[in-house]
Amino acid sequence: MTQNIHQHRILILDFGSQYTQLVARRVRELGVYCELWAWDVTEAQIRGFNPNGIILSGGPESTTEFGSPRAPEYVFNAGVPVLGVCYGMQTMAMQLGGHVEGSNEREFGYAQVEVKTNSALVRDIQDALSATGAPLLDVWMSHGDKVTAIPEGFETVASTDTCPFAIMANEEKRFYGVQFHPEVTHTRQGQRMLERFVLDICQCEALWTPAKIIDDAVNRIREQVGNDSVILGLSGGVDSSVTAMLLHRAIGDRLTCVFVDNGLLRLNEADQVLEMFGDNFGLNIVHVAAEDRFLNELAGEDEPEAKRKIIGRVFVEVFDEEANKQAEVKWLAQGTIYPDVIESAASATGKAHVIKSHHNVGGLPKEMKLGLVEPLKELFKDEVRKIGLELGLPYNMLYRHPFPGPGLGVRVLGEVKKEYCDLLRRADAIFIEELHKADLYNKVSQAFTVFLPVRSVGVMGDGRKYDWVVALRAVETIDFMTAHWAHLPYDFLGRVSNRIINEVDGISRVVYDVSGKPPATIEWE
């Protein structure tokens, strides 16, 4: 009998903090399953989930404002430990009889809290000692309001000069509140505090590990599809690749992968995908050479969103045609991951600002009569990569820089032509190769080349030429929500520019993009 890896579980209620998904990832890193739900869930839903503990996230609202979010009352009557983080601590304090006030002294950034009372949450945890020998913790604050009176039954565990209740605890009921963010790396002992809460106080077992996740996924796939066949669109990206490997392990040759070469891929990418998954791993792959079809559909179109829609529509058409040829196929597999599910749920309930719709959720043709298999839908991206390694996929493929779904279709500015794609592919390959050679590839978060639809005069030998311009883009970021342009060495940039202009006939000038996000986006289109 396979162990139930979902048996021990934490429920995280989301009050809108930008860090909430990070809380969930940190809990998962401890080896414990958790789910992220909107703050206004019902008692019946919480009972149905049956968590070992509940975490109340931070949030941008003020608890002192009328109508601001509150935790369901059942949270405090469920008989399980509760940890309130920042806003979560404030709503806990107010709902249990304490007091919160707005403060003129907004605390944002690094702070040092002094531990006053021993607590299960911070037992044996410290960063330094005060002059009087009290333990000190380096933490990351981000709040305006603060708790000014704690509820009955609570005690002050830690404080700062401006925040009298930085940590509060009711040890008997196992309720804890922290006015800082333990999930961010700036709180140096934050992960140890979460470990104290999840493993010690909630008494969860670390059952959520890559090997066990794979076993669980394989069993669930077999249970879901039985003896049926499955079809998957394989792009060579992380999510579809790991999905393919899981399905292949579960059902072997009953998986058919459709690889659509749309002519918008990186240099030699189609050959690499076919060699890795077909030759090395023995998957059934249908290779559809559809470059002409995509480029014909894109001809004359220069508006970025219209190009995205054309590429998406043609992909669905091509994939649908191939699926219809596979008469025995009953299931469609997709590489949907947990953040896609969270984003779609938030979009449906109107509880989050959605920047753009995700291609994996809701992008299927309505007439497709296949069941849906989504083996990664409980996993964050970092977890997908870890199980990819466990399944034997190469590190450099799993940790490659992100590549947009529409591919070079949004890296060739304006109208997309084969000539432009071919030039861009070669220029981009040189940039990436040089980043690897200089040991800079893993020091930047994303790097790529953009084709600009402008010509520039150049001099080659005794002659002048009038050729195309490309831009190099490299950024450093933690979450891709904001990014800094990467300060690559001048001699490195000079070397890349030299190689591109000399080796790629048709390019006369190379520029470097020094725009941050905001105001610019990472991709140009």
Swiss-Prot record:
Functional description taken from the UniProt entry: Catalyzes the synthesis of GMP from XMP.
Native organism: Pectobacterium atrosepticum (strain SCRI 1043 / ATCC BAA-672) (Erwinia carotovora subsp. atroseptica)
Protein name in UniProt: GMP synthase [glutamine-hydrolyzing]
Segments forming domain GMPS ATP-PPase: 208-400
Xref: Pfam families: GATase, GMP_synt_C, NAD_synthase
Reaction catalysis annotation: XMP + L-glutamine + ATP + H2O = GMP + L-glutamate + AMP + diphosphate + 2 H(+)
Coiled-coil region(s): none
Alphabetized GO MF terms: ATP binding; GMP synthase activity
The Glutamine amidotransferase type-1 domain, residue ranges: 9-207
Residues that, per the record, bind ATP: S235, G236, G237, V238, D239, S240, S241
Entry-linked NCBIfam families: guaA_Cterm, guaA_Nterm, PRK00074.1
Pathway: Purine metabolism; GMP biosynthesis; GMP from XMP (L-Gln route): step 1/1
A Gene Ontology cellular-component term: cytosol
Alphabetically ordered keywords of this record: ATP-binding, Glutamine amidotransferase, GMP biosynthesis, Ligase, Nucleotide-binding, Purine biosynthesis
UniProt key word Nucleus: no
Subunit structure: Homodimer.
EC number: 6.3.5.2
Active-site residues, as the UniProt record annotates them: C86, H181, E183
